[in-house]
Design a protein with these regions (language model features):
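Compositionally biased terminal segments of proteins
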Residues: 1-172
Length: 172
């Protein structure tokens, strides 16, 4: 199934309503969306996405995430984000009550896409809505942070090369 922006929001709101039925306490939970779904939610790309990925969520909502096919098996993403990515998350104002939904920052998403470099990732970050809005100074720092945490020189060199080519092509 493919999801456009409205369908992603509807799914997140249904998840929020279901969590409110399960947990009637005042507790508020969180979920950070990454990948193409995050870019769709941020209105940076207008394609549909095959899945909704979450890099981080309150443990209490994980069973519901699985029931709603929100993918938490994104270990590859974890290595593409600096440890402090949570400082830059953007809250989604979609009217949820029980779960605060966030997206990773645009810069963190670009780094993760540069690290992956699948065709759809390249297409996503080649969109003017992405490269014209990205903070290049922040992106420079995040690339170095991610490279510092990588385990081998091959991956470091690939990410640096991908970023250098991206920056040369799109930075104005």
């Amino acid at each position: 199934m493919d999801f456009n922006r409205e369908e992603i929001i509807n799914r997140l709101l249904q998840l929020d309503r279901d969590m409110a039925l399960i947990d009637t306490t005042e507790d508020i939970y969180s979920c950070v969306i990454v990948g193409g779904g995050a870019l769709v939610l941020m209105n940076k790309i207008y394609r549909s996405t095959h899945d909704i990925d979450s890099i981080d969520a309150s443990k209490e909502i994980i069973p519901l995430l699985e029931a709603y096919n929100i993918n938490m098996n994104v270990r590859a993403y974890v290595l593409s984000f600096p440890d402090n990515y949570r400082e830059r998350v953007q809250k989604l104002e979609i009217g949820s009550k029980k779960i605060n939904f966030y997206t990773a920052s645009l810069e963190d998403l670009v780094v993760s896409k540069l690290n992956s470099m699948r065709d759809k990732d390249i297409d996503d970050i080649s969109n003017p809505l992405v490269y014209n809005d990205v903070n290049w100074e922040v992106l420079d720092l995040l690339i170095e942070d991610v490279c510092y945490g990588m385990l081998n020189d091959y991956d470091v060199n690939n990410l640096r090369r991908n970023y250098s080519e991206y920056k040369e092509k799109y930075k104005k």
